[in-house]
Regions:
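Cell-envelope/extracellular polymer assembly enzymes that use nucleotide-activated donors
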Residues: 4-6, 38, 190
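Donor nucleotide-sugar binding loop of glycosyltransferases
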Residues: 14-17, 46, 75, 101
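Short, well-formed alpha-helical segments that are part of the catalytic scaffolds
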Residues: 14-30
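Conserved donor nucleotide-binding strand/loop of the catalytic core
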Residues: 37-40, 51-85
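A conserved acidic beta->alpha catalytic loop
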Residues: 43-52, 98
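Short active-site alpha-helical segment characteristic of glycosyltransferases
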Residues: 187-194
Length: 242
């Protein structure tokens, strides 16, 4: 690769899953030939050994940093913290469970270079044949309904905004994330909405994905997220993303 990369991992009580995730990412980065690569683990107020596990991995990969949020502030807060601190020219945020294999970063990079985009959105919905392990019937269909309402509320064209695998050109990321208001799960829709509002080209890219047991988001809590696209629209009307 000809550009440098920061990989941001928001983590809350990920002591058990994080070691394997970091091993896979470190191995990938060593194979990739990046001129500079860093891993940023953003601890969101974990009460287990997440921070210790991440710091131990620094012995194997010195360009690994651990950022700590002031308490459990939410996934959106954690991703913003990492994006505003990263040093690479590109910045990927990936869920700590690696439900999308880290190798799919190559796919996002190719899409950005091919289409001249500043944001690449990993998508489960564009090609569902790439899903190895599906979510439950209930969760998958809740996701479809959410997407329809999200598109109605925001005008965004994407078929999947909630896949935790997105790549940003770092200068664009700083402009987007400094305007972000949502600290919880609704931040994905918000940052894509802000990017589109700023005129940044965003491309949706099909990626491999597998449902990994151990989600910290209940289906009913996810239902509350149906309000988020409407809050984004309301914030836009009020001029809060200027």
């Amino acid at each position: 690769m000809t550009r440098s990369i920061s990989i941001i991992i928001p983590a809350y009580n990920e002591e058990k899953r994080l070691p394997a995730t970091l091993r896979l990412i470190i191995a990938y980065l060593r194979r990739g030939g990046w001129p500079f690569a860093e891993i940023i683990v953003v601890d969101d107020g974990s009460t287990d050994g997440t921070v210790q596990v991440a710091e131990q991995a620094r012995a194997e990969f010195p360009d690994l940093r651990v950022l700590r949020n002031p308490g459990n502030r939410g996934k959106g807060y954690a991703v913003r913290h990492g994006m505003l601190e990263c040093r690479g020219e590109w910045a990927l945020y990936s869920d700590a469970d690696l439900s999308t294999p880290i190798e799919e970063l190559d796919t996002l990079c190719q899409a950005i270079e091919r289409d001249g985009a500043l944001v690449a959105v990993g998508s489960r919905a564009l090609d569902r044949r790439l899903i190895g392990v599906h979510q439950s019937f209930f969760r998958e269909n809740i996701g479809r309904v959410f997407n329809l309402l999200m598109r109605l509320a925001t005008g965004l064209p994407f078929h999947d905004t909630q896949c935790g695998f997105k790549l940003f050109e770092t200068r664009a990321a700083r402009e987007i994330f400094r305007r972000q208001l949502r600290d919880g799960l609704g931040f994905d829709v918000e940052v894509l909405f802000i990017g589109r509002r700023l005129g940044y080209r965003e491309v949706e890219v099909p990626v491999e994905w597998n449902d990994v047991p151990g989600t910290k988001v209940s289906a009913w809590r996810g239902l509350l997220g149906f309000l988020d696209p409407w809050l984004v629209r309301w914030n836009s009307i009020r001029g809060r993303y200027a």
